[in-house]
């Protein structure tokens, strides 16, 4: 009888552990089980300063990222601008081969063969309008060819520690071998914004226009939540609805600003994507409490402590 009772308790303990592992908060003190309202295949929330994971669900599942691929494209373009190998005001010639693979149902800014367009306008189209034609033109300018740019993308992913990511396109169109994870995208999001804070200038634009073309930024949190200032959305049939979102909010005690990043992959609808991102950002700001400490030398520090997760 004791043996059967022990076996039952062991199975019960294993079941409880498996359920708890579905969504956990990682802190320096303890793990708690939260209940953010998210409908998606995988997601993660990280602290913007330390990069610590606040909550996650299947964050290491490899998936097609759709236009979240453009975050790496943007990273490489901004890196080239920083290095001086390309200039913001440089006029890039659009070649027919660059845009010939962009279909009518893809996001684009309607570039035409033979025109010249500035790098700044291309970056605006890439980030705010998620334009695939802009991604391809920039990829050729930075990498020399699509293959050359993809090699740069994968080299940078390796350098940043994105160990479950492989790129096979600069635009994010469904392509075999193009995959990443929610965790890897959180790594990229932190590095992109820390290395190139000018990214916020483009990702916070609610509307994009180029000639007669106009498009609203699909990160609908912009304008609804004044603390949200980026970053990128994506959608394909294979990837579902995806988003990397970030917000910066000020707290009263101690007076300081905090930033949180949220990543969602594989939401079933655009509304689920936005609602889930908002829920995760709100949870991220409630997951930690900050308080100030003055050590014996008089130095002022801020200590981060965990709060219980929501019931």
Model-based region annotation:
Residues 25-28, 302:
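N-terminal compositionally biased, intrinsically disordered segments and leader/signal-like regions
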Residues 21, 34-36, 253:
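Sterically constrained small-residue positions within well-ordered secondary structures
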Residues 2-14:
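Bacterial N-terminal signal peptides that target proteins for export
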Residues 162-166, 174-311:
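Domain-terminus/edge residues, biased toward the C-terminal soluble/receptor-binding domains
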Residues 13-24:
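Bacterial N-terminal signal peptides
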Residues 4-7, 118, 145, 217, ...:
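Secondary-structure junction/capping motif
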Residues 28-183, 190-196:
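Active-site-adjacent loops and short helices of periplasmic peptidoglycan-processing enzymes
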């Amino acid at each position: 009888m004791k043996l059967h009772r022990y076996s039952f308790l062991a199975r019960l303990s294993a079941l409880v552990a498996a359920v708890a592992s579905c969504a956990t908060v990682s802190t320096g003190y303890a793990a708690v089980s939260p209940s953010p309202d998210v409908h998606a295949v995988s997601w993660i929330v990280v602290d913007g300063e330390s990069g610590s994971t606040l909550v996650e669900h299947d964050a290491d599942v490899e998936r097609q990222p759709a236009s979240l691929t453009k975050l790496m494209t943007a990273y490489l373009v901004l890196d080239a601008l920083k290095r001086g190998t390309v200039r913001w005001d440089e006029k890039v010639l659009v070649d027919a081969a660059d845009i010939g693979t962009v279909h009518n149902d893809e996001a684009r800014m309607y570039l035409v063969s033979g025109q010249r367009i500035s790098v700044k306008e291309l970056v605006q189209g890439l980030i705010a309008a998620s334009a695939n034609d802009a991604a391809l033109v920039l990829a050729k300018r930075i990498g020399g060819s699509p293959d050359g740019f993809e090699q740069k993308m994968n080299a940078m992913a390796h350098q940043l520690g994105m160990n479950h990511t492989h790129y096979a396109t600069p635009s994010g169109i469904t392509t075999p071998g193009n995959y990443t994870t929610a965790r890897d995208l959180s790594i990229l999001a932190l590095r992109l914004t820390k290395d190139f804070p000018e990214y916020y200038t483009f990702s916070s634009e609610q509307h994009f226009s180029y000639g007669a073309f106009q498009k609203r930024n699909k990160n609908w949190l912009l304008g609804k939540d004044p603390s949200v200032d980026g970053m990128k959305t994506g959608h394909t049939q294979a990837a579902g609805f995806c988003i990397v979102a970030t917000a910066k909010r000020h707290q009263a005690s101690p007076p300081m600003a905090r930033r949180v990043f949220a990543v969602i992959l594989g939401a079933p609808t655009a509304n689920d994507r936005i609602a889930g991102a908002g829920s995760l950002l709100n949870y991220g700001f409630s997951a930690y409490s900050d308080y100030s400490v003055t050590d014996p030398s008089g130095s002022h520090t801020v200590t981060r402590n965990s709060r219980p997760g929501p019931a």
